[in-house]
């Protein structure tokens, strides 16, 4: 039997056995995760193209243009992700405590600093990693440079030349928290674990959803409402796929959801060294986002090849991608990985990293380090 065959089947009488002609194959946990990642990424890519879902565009529209619809879309996505993820955890379907976001030991300064770098780099490149994948699918060749440079600097920070510096910074500032999440803080105040989880999730998700829907223009934008709902559910879908559908005691996989720093770096490595690499949820999500955007762009007539206007434009965009790659690794995620997926766990570390991203973005859009927009979105 070849390595690509699925080694089991379900017969008409319910028996399970070896692969046979005419029988229905049974997907194992690994294959379920791969297919789920492709589907989730595809939908995210399509929604991202149609709605313009992007933290940078949201903040720029809110702060500079007075248009608060996109930031409400992002807030709704976070609120839905928090509610759905915490319901999965409360129901015992997914153990989010196994994720990288809920570690008891982390470096607050490094995560915040990484967020600052990522946020400022996002302004320089005029979009985050996930947005670059969406734009690449639409034919934006500038985004190809962003994706490749981001991947290279992420690998350099994870395992390469920058890694020793990162490790030294973490080692000098790492601390162990008695509570690593908002529910844990409430539980420390005397609430039961379940009550603490439900209270924290209810208050935070309700506040975000109310913030979204009190805006009249947002309520009159069904496309933006749908985008926020779908993206929030995609985050929960990723948790469900890796933490429940793909759970396997004999072949455990990381419990995770949408994020676009290490996965973009891993995807580039897989493209170059596929015989020595293994597909995982993050890699196929990256491929799925590109495919979803490409198919949607072709079907809707949005596909158009675009390039850089000047060498300076390319240098600035590539520099921003480098900051995003290095900063995203230090922050353990990006505007999606920490701003949506990490935030959905209510982890304190994710909130610190996301705060850094917001401050870095503000510095680029409004602060002393302000830079003008580029035509890359």
What are these language model-derived features?
Residues 1-3, 11-12, 17-18:
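A cross-taxon signal for low-complexity, glycine/charged-rich
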Residues 4-6, 18-377:
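Membrane-interfacial helix-loop segments of redox and metal-homeostasis proteins
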């Amino acid at each position: 039997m070849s390595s690509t065959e699925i080694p089991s089947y379900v017969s008409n009488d319910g028996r399970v056995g070896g692969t046979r002609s005419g029988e229905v194959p049974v997907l194992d946990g690994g294959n379920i995760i791969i297919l789920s990642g492709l589907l989730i990424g595809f939908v995210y890519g399509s929604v991202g193209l149609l709605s313009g879902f992007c933290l940078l565009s949201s903040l720029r529209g809110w702060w500079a243009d007075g248009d608060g619809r996109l930031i409400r879309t992002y807030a709704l996505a976070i609120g839905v992700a928090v509610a759905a993820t915490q319901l999965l955890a409360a129901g015992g379907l997914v153990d989010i405590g196994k994720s990288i976001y809920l570690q008891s030991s982390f470096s607050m300064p490094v995560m915040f600093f990484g967020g600052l770098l990522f946020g400022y780099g996002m302004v320089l490149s005029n979009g985050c990693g996930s947005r670059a994948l969406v734009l690449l699918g639409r034919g934006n060749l500038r985004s190809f440079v962003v994706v490749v440079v981001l991947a290279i600097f992420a690998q350099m920070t994870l395992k390469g030349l920058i890694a020793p510096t990162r490790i030294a910074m973490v080692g000098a500032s790492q601390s162990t928290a008695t509570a690593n999440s908002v529910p844990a803080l409430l539980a420390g105040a005397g609430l039961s674990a379940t009550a603490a989880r439900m209270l924290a999730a209810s208050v935070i998700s309700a506040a975000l959803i109310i913030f979204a829907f009190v805006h009249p223009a947002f309520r009159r934008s069904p496309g933006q409402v749908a985008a926020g709902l779908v993206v929030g559910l995609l985050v929960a879908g990723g948790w469900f796929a890796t933490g429940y559908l793909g759970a396997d005691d004999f072949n455990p996989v990381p419990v995770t959801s949408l994020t676009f720093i290490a996965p973009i770096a891993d995807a580039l490595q897989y493209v170059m060294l596929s015989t020595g690499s293994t597909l995982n949820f993050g890699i196929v999500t990256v491929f799925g986002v590109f495919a979803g955007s490409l198919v949607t762009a072709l079907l809707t007539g949005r596909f158009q090849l675009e390039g850089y206007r000047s060498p300076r434009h390319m240098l600035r965009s590539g520099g921003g991608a480098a900051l995003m790659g290095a900063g995203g690794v230090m922050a353990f995620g990006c505007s999606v990985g920490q701003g949506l997926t990490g935030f959905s766990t209510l982890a304190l570390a994710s909130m610190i990293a996301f705060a850094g991203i917001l401050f870095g973005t503000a510095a680029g859009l409004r602060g002393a380090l302000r830079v003008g927009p580029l035509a890359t979105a």
